[in-house]
Regions:
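A short beta-strand motif that forms the metal-chelation/ATP-contact edge
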Residues: 10, 251-253, 403-406
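Bacterial Sec-dependent signal peptides at the C-terminal "C-region" and cleavage site
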Residues: 12-22
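Short linear recognition/processing motifs and adjacent strand/loop elements at protein termini
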Residues: 20-29, 33-35, 43, 47-49, ...
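Active-site-proximal helix/loop segments of hydrolytic enzymes
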Residues: 279-443
Length: 443
């Protein structure tokens, strides 16, 4: 009887293994694609070997594997073969559509007004990237003299133009030329406040130099050379706030407190709810790992004396705008967004791209990003993937020092071994906390 049961168990095990690997991606065996690559991500059984179109695939110790196949225009046949199973995938890649260059249309200067707060003023007529040079306030008066696609060209000064989305402005008639009223400056222990007043709302730009910030207000209706510049010395570690009410700009630049007990840190667990984030080789959802790390980090920082605010403490949907508003309402000094990375539709080596990277947008956050990237890699044992710039919504505000930490790559088999370990969340949390301590305390 015992021999019979043993034989049955061995038979069932063999039957299960004969099915072979489990693919998380791709989800369909046949697809029409505009992508340059097809990604194969999944888990292999013990002792299983896999090849994709004849190329042997590396399998991590936990069974995780990943591979990318470059797609040519037209039919693509991909054979995934193991010693247990063979599957065939078919992709049809559409021919790329050649982009048509849209010309700039010039026209006589006319006046428009910004119709909502936080309207991006850009250096180029492109909706995306690092081209934001200001975020304009509602009722700001602008002069436009051209258009390209969905953007108007904004005339700021004789040697300065910018671009704003057509949807962000409304036409107005009979605008009166603004006049300068006054300028004032006040210094406090850890902050400097400067004001500059006009008879109506005017556009501005920011330019960060090594030791100062140039805050420029433009009055092109008066003349092409009417530019008012505030030269604001900046501390080593700082953040700033800009407000505009009835033509008066208030610019406040604050020095970051040097004691953790005086710091408010917003800990942001990326994604959540229906936003799953990236999917790992073994089928894990990024949102859950993000939350686990965030909870560990929050507890660590509270123990160290920091005031901690979380954007989510459970698996729920929180919009990007709400995450930013949480930080602003709580007067956050530091914002840390926690994520795991994945490979996009670009010619990356799926095995080379691994480890921890940290993103920042504003120059005041660069040093903090460098410290945290080094600290997380040291504590978590991840490869250092670098410090980079990106226009992520949660780190764009200048009201705080903000970074987004990509702790590891969900789609990398070696990283999969790390982020699936029980200690990963605690190690990453310690790395971020150590980075905050070093950055805040190293005045």
């Amino acid at each position: 009887m015992k021999k019979g049961l043993l034989f049955l168990l061995l038979f069932l095990l063999g039957a299960a293994q004969s099915f072979g690997y489990e693919l998380i991606l791709p989800r369909e065996k046949s697809a029409i694609s505009n992508s340059n690559y097809a990604f194969f991500v999944g888990k292999a059984n013990n002792g299983e070997t896999i090849s994709i179109n004849g190329c042997p695939i590396y399998i991590a110790q936990n069974g995780a594997f990943a591979h990318s196949v470059k797609l040519k225009v037209g039919e693509n046949r991909v054979v995934v073969r193991s010693n247990y199973n063979t599957q065939i995938y078919n992709f049809y890649k559409n021919a790329p559509v050649k982009a048509t260059e849209i010309p700039v249309t010039d026209f006589d200067i006319r006046t428009v007004v910004v119709n909502h707060d936080n309207a991006p003023l850009r250096s180029t007529p492109i909706d995306g990237g690092l081209n934001r040079i200001a975020h304009l306030f509602k009722d700001t008066t602008l002069l436009i003299n051209g258009s390209k696609g969905q953007f108007y060209r904004v005339f700021l000064a004789k040697d300065k133009v910018a671009w704003i989305a057509k949807k962000d402005v409304d036409n107005i008639e009979g605008s009166q030329t603004a006049s300068f009223i006054n300028m004032d400056s006040k210094k406090f222990k850890n902050a400097t406040i400067q004001t500059i007043s006009f008879s109506k709302n005017l556009p501005y730009t920011l330019e960060e130099k090594d030791k100062e910030i140039l805050f420029k207000v433009y009055n092109p209706e008066l003349s092409g050379s009417s530019v008012y510049t505030l030269n604001l010395p900046k501390p080593e570690k700082y953040y700033y706030n800009i407000d505009l009410k009835e033509g008066t700009y208030t610019f406040k630049i604050s020095e970051l407190p040097s004691a953790l007990e005086e710091i408010t840190v917003v800990v942001d667990a990326g994604h959540g709810g229906s936003e799953k984030g990236a999917i790992g080789c073994l089928g894990q959802e990024e949102k859950n790992i993000n939350l686990k790390i965030a909870l560990e980090l929050a507890e660590t920082l509270k123990t160290l004396g920091a005031n901690v605010i979380m954007t989510r403490e459970c698996d729920g949907n929180v919009s990007l705008n709400d995450r930013v508003e949480i930080a602003k309402k709580n007067d956050a000094n530091i914002f840390v967004s926690i994520h795991l990375n994945s490979i996009g539709d670009i010619p990356m080596n799926i095995h080379k791209n691994r480890g921890t990277s940290v993103y920042y947008f504003n120059p005041n956050s660069k040093k903090f990003a460098e410290v945290v990237e080094k600290s997380v890699s040291k504590n978590a044992g991840t490869r250092r993937d670098g410090v980079k710039t990106a226009s992520f919504a949660v780190i764009r505000p200048y009201n705080y020092v903000g970074i987004l930490v990509e702790t590891a790559y969900m789609t990398n088999p070696c990283d999969s071994v790390l982020y699936n370990s029980e200690s990963f969340a605690a190690k990453v949390a310690k790395g971020i906390a150590d980075g905050i301590i070093e950055y805040v305390g190293n005045q």
